[in-house]
C-alpha cells in the first residue's frame, strides 16, 4: 500500500466556473480537510460584505488567521483543499507561502471555463440566493473577471487544468 504525502490543493478559475464543486469533490476523493472561504466569511462577517473592498478586507483577515493552522495541518501529514480564489498572481503567492512553509507538494487546480458558461452557472446559482446578494449579475461577473489572470509557466506551480465546455 502506498501512503500519499500531505499536499496542498488550491483553486483558480473565473467566478462560477465550478471551483467550489471541484474543491468539495477533491477533498472527498483525497480524504483532505477543506476550508471554504465563502463559508468562513459568512460565519465571521454576516451581512458585512457588500462590495469588492469589503471582500478584499475581510478575506485578507481570514488568510492571516488561517495561515499558521493550514501550515500546521500540512506539516503533520494532513492534505488540505483550499476553496479560496487563486485568480491573480498576487493571490497565488499566499498559497506558495503555505506549501513552501510546510515543505509539502501542491496542485493548482485550474478550472478553465468560457465566460458564457460561467455566466449561465452564475444565473442558476443566483436563483436560490436572497435578493441583494453580492456577485450575482452578469455585470458583476464582468467587473470581477477583468482582474482574472490565468496561471502561467513562469509562476512554477504544478497546474492541473480542467477544461469545462
Where is each model-derived feature located?
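Conserved GTP-binding G-domain of TRAFAC-class P-loop NTPases and closely related GTPase folds
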Residues: 2-8, 25, 29, 33, ...
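Hydrophobic anchor at the beta1->P-loop junction of P-loop NTPases
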Residues: 11
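P-loop (Walker A) phosphate-binding loop of NTP-binding proteins
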Residues: 14
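Conserved substrate/cofactor phosphate-moiety recognition/catalytic segment
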Residues: 17, 21-78, 124
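ATP-dependent NMP and nucleoside kinases share a basic, alpha-helical "lid"
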Residues: 43, 48-49, 74, 86-127
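Flexible, glycine- and charge-enriched loops at secondary-structure boundaries
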Residues: 52-60, 85-88, 134, 138
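Amphipathic alpha-helical transducer elements in NTP-driven molecular machines
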Residues: 56-63, 67, 112, 138-145
Amino acid at each position: 500500500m502506498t501512503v500519499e504525502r500531505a499536499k496542498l490543493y488550491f483553486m483558480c478559475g473565473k467566478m462560477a466556473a465550478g471551483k467550489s464543486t471541484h474543491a468539495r469533490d477533491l477533498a472527498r476523493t483525497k480524504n483532505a480537510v477543506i476550508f471554504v472561504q465563502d463559508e468562513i466569511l459568512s460565519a465571521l462577517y454576516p451581512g458585512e460584505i457588500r462590495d469588492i473592498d469589503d471582500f478584499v478586507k475581510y478575506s485578507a483577515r481570514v488568510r492571516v488567521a488561517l495561515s499558521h493552522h493550514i501550515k500546521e495541518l500540512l506539516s503533520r501529514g494532513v492534505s488540505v483543499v483550499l476553496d479560496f480564489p487563486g485568480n491573480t498572481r498576487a493571490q497565488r503567492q499566499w498559497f506558495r507561502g503555505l506549501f513552501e512553509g510546510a515543505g509539502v507538494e501542491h496542485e493548482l487546480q485550474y478550472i478553465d471555463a468560457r465566460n458564457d458558461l460561467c455566466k449561465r452557472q452564475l444565473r442558476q446559482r443566483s436563483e436560490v440566493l436572497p435578493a441583494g446578494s453580492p456577485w450575482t449579475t452578469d455585470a458583476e461577473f464582468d467587473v470581477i473577471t477583468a482582474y482574472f489572470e490565468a496561471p502561467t509557466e513562469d509562476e512554477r506551480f504544478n497546474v492541473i487544468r480542467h477544461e469545462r465546455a
